[in-house]
């Protein structure tokens, strides 16, 4: 009886994991981190329960956008090695089920944010989800190599949403956090596109290396990385412990530029992968340090 019960539970566990992967959890982790950063560094007080609700809504909104993105992109996901194991092309979840999950989570996250937190945070969450789905996924991604640059605005909104959850208004400080993520996004994804250049070409996605070549992409990565560096120093102007922040942000940022320069010089995929991996670690450490420097 016990063996039969365990056997019956396995398919359920696998199904739950499939739906979890549909929500793009790796992206969700960074989205939640940046959103929580906005909540923590914002002036004023917020009830812990409201902070938790805001964080959950940001997470659900991110997952909703990820699910609808997978629904819309399931045709091109099936063509690329990196994405063909995703739940829809792998045949684990139907397109209709993915769309239903995305729409339901979108409605729940935005509605709860508006009712339990405040209207502006709910509106910004709706804009973030809508921008990622309609502007980036449905329009920009398959039409222009600037898809990542413009579409990155959606992923840069969570710290503003976190900030407005506390204050009810947008500020310069929250816009600085937005700008950091906005400038970080292109070199992060262009490093990935260098790694998967032929995959994007096969799927006819106009990523920068496909439309303008590898050398041009490397120049863009280097330029954006250099421009990102001084922007990441700006939080030191308003954090309570600017010394802690700057002694962390400066070497982190310099290493980011060094990695970008390595990509520029190299034609080895190893350096592209290192740049991509480091960019994730970089953002995680940077925003963690922003939180710690606010106390």
From Swiss-Prot:
CDD domains (alphabetical) = PT_UbiA_Cox10 (cd13957)
Residues passing through the membrane, by range: 30-50, 51-71, 93-115, 119-136, 148-168, 175-195, 219-239, 244-264, 275-295
Question: What are the annotated disulfide bridges?
Answer: none
Q: Name one GO cellular component term.
A: plasma membrane
**Gene3D superfamilies cross-referenced by the UniProt entry:** UbiA prenyltransferase
Question: What does the record give as its pathway?
Answer: Porphyrin-containing compound metabolism; heme O biosynthesis; heme O from protoheme: step 1/1
Which molecular-function annotations from GO does this UniProt entry contain? protoheme IX farnesyltransferase activity
- Give the reactions, separated by semicolons, that this protein catalyses: heme b + (2E,6E)-farnesyl diphosphate + H2O = Fe(II)-heme o + diphosphate
Sorted keywords for this record are: Cell inner membrane, Cell membrane, Heme biosynthesis, Membrane, Transferase, Transmembrane, Transmembrane helix
Q: Which domain of life is it from?
A: Bacteria
Range of residues in the leader sequence: none
The UniProt entry's GO biological process terms, in alphabetical order, are: heme O biosynthetic process
- Free-text function comment from the UniProt entry: Converts heme B (protoheme IX) to heme O by substitution of the vinyl group on carbon 2 of heme B porphyrin ring with a hydroxyethyl farnesyl side group.
What more does the entry say? Carbon 2 of the heme B porphyrin ring is defined according to the Fischer nomenclature.
Which family is annotated?
Belongs to the UbiA prenyltransferase family. Protoheme IX farnesyltransferase subfamily.
Q: What is this protein called?
A: Protoheme IX farnesyltransferase
This protein's gene is called: ctaB
């Amino acid at each position: 009886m016990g063996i039969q019960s365990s056997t019956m539970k396995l398919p359920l566990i696998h199904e739950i994991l499939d739906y979890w992967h549909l929500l793009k959890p790796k992206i969700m982790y960074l989205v939640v981190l940046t959103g929580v950063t906005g909540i923590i560094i914002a002036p004023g007080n917020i009830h812990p329960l409201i902070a938790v609700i805001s964080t959950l809504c940001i997470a659900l909104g991110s997952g909703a956008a990820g699910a609808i993105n997978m629904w819309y992109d399931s045709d091109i996901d099936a063509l690329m090695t990196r994405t063909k194991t995703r739940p829809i092309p792998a045949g684990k979840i139907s397109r209709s089920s993915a769309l239903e999950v995305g729409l339901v989570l979108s409605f729940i996250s935005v509605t709860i944010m508006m009712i339990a937190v405040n209207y502006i945070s709910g509106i910004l969450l709706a804009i973030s989800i809508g921008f990622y789905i309609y502007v980036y996924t449905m329009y920009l991604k398959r039409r222009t190599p600037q898809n990542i640059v413009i579409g990155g605005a959606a992923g840069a909104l969570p710290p503003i949403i976190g900030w407005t959850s506390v204050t009810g208004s947008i500020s310069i400080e929250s816009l600085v956090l937005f700008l950091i993520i906005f400038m970080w996004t292109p070199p992060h994804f262009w490093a990935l596109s260098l790694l998967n250049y032929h995959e994007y070409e096969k799927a006819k996605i106009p990523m920068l290396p496909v439309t303008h070549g590898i050398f041009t992409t490397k120049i863009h990565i280097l330029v954006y990385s250099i421009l990102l560096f001084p922007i990441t120093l700006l939080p030191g102007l308003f954090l309570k412990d600017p010394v802690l922040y700057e002694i962390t942000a400066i070497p982190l940022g310099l290493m980011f530029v060094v990695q970008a320069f390595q990509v520029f010089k190299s034609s080895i995929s190893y350096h592209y992968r290192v740049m991509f991996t480091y960019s994730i670690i970089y953002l995680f450490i940077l925003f963690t340090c922003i939180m710690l420097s606010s106390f």
